[in-house]
Regions:
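Acidic, metal-coordinating catalytic segment for phosphate/diphosphate chemistry
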Residues: 12-47, 53
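A glycine-rich, hydrophobic loop/mini-helix early in the fold
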Residues: 45-77
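Conserved hydrophobic "DFG−1" position in protein kinase catalytic cores
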Residues: 19, 50, 59, 124-125, ...
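Short, Lys/Arg-enriched N-terminal segments with co-localized hydrophobic residues
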Residues: 3-13
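Nudix hydrolase/Nudix homology domain
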Residues: 11, 34, 70-71, 114-186
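The catalytic Nudix box helix
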Residues: 58-59, 75-108
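Short loop segments at secondary-structure junctions
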Residues: 23, 52-55, 63, 126-130, ...
Length: 186
């Protein structure tokens, strides 16, 4: 995720998103981050779940100064930039936020969820990554850790992990277990 990313010379740059319809078709328009979406307009968001050989999931703690969900554990992800496809956005977010480089063939699309103002593509990367090998993006990420699914859901219950909604987690776990990809709409 990116909040007011620094540009050249330390100035803030405007992040632009492509506008999509509810089926993911481009509307031929862009929106500057922070501007309000109208009904029927969506932007593309990617969530990348890194899963190790023990079935644990890599989560990250958002930096304390962020406006949206500060000091909250969440999945790695963010909005696709204008002109960027979902796969490119997923690889970029992994690299920026955690320092994990992934080839396109390493990432598997689990499916897409329609949310209030976004179409959220869930991706999986299967990789054993030592925490010591991560390069956290200090502007956005304060910490990272591996958790089991049970630990993750306990964190959701105790409000220490962002609650994306029960349908989200149901879909995520079904997809990680290899059930057929379903594209539920919320």
């Amino acid at each position: 995720m990116r909040e007011n990313p620094p540009g050249k010379g330390g100035r803030l740059t405007m992040e632009k998103w492509d506008l999509l319809d509810g089926d993911g078709r481009p509307l031929g328009q862009t929106l500057v981050r922070g501007d309000k979406l109208r009904p029927g307009q969506y932007h593309l968001v990617v969530h990348i779940w890194v899963e190790d050989s023990k079935g644990r999931l890599l989560i990250q703690k958002r930096a304390p100064h962020l406006k949206l969900m500060p000091d909250t554990w969440a999945v790695t992800g963010g909005s696709a930039l204008a002109g960027e496809d979902s796969l490119t956005a997923a690889a970029r977010e992994l690299s920026e936020e955690l320092g994990i480089e992934a080839a396109p063939s390493d990432l598997k699309l689990l499916g897409r969820l329609r949310r209030r103002n976004s179409l959220c593509d869930l991706w999986r990367l299967r990789r054993d990554v030592p925490l010591s090998a991560l390069r956290l993006q200090k502007e956005e990420v304060a910490d990272a850790r591996w958790v089991s699914r049970g630990q993750l859901m306990e964190m959701v219950k105790c409000r220490r992990f962002h609650h994306y909604g029960s349908p989200y987690f149901d879909f995520l776990f079904r997809s990680l277990d290899g059930e057929p990809d379903i594209l539920p709409v919320k």
